[in-house]
Amino acid sequence: MERLLITLILVCTMNNITNAQNPFYGQYHTPHETVPFDRIETEHYEPAILEGIKLQNAEIEAIIQNPEKADFTNTIEAFEESGKLLDKVVAVFGNMLSAETNDDLQELAQKIMPLLSEHSNNITLNEKLFARVKEVYNQKETLQLTQEQKQLLEN
């Protein structure tokens, strides 16, 4: 039992060290939060993408499990705010893949692109999420939305 506990503590500690060293976690701490390309390694992408998928899945689940009536804030805005980490990592990965590709990035793309497609499909085809969005959309004339909110709802 003691050995198991020590192993678990070591794994958690190593995970925290790895997370602390991955520039995708947290703020970049660069002028204007520009991407610190000099600190990003190929091995940073996959764990950050997997964590981003996990976080967005939890965010989507929170939206669809919300017991309150669907409204602009708890559905549309919440959906818009979901997936920030994933968006951040995928944007950098996509740009690097097209601008400075190499065999390692292409191999990683072969591995993660199906995961990203599946994740996207799971969101866009989620019937419970669609029902909440539709409920808000059907009220759009009575919601007194700003132009920006209307555009967000339409898209």
Question: What spans do the regions from the language model cover?
Answer:
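Bacterial Sec-dependent N-terminal signal peptides
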Residues: 1-21
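N-terminal helix-rich structural modules
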Residues: 21-155
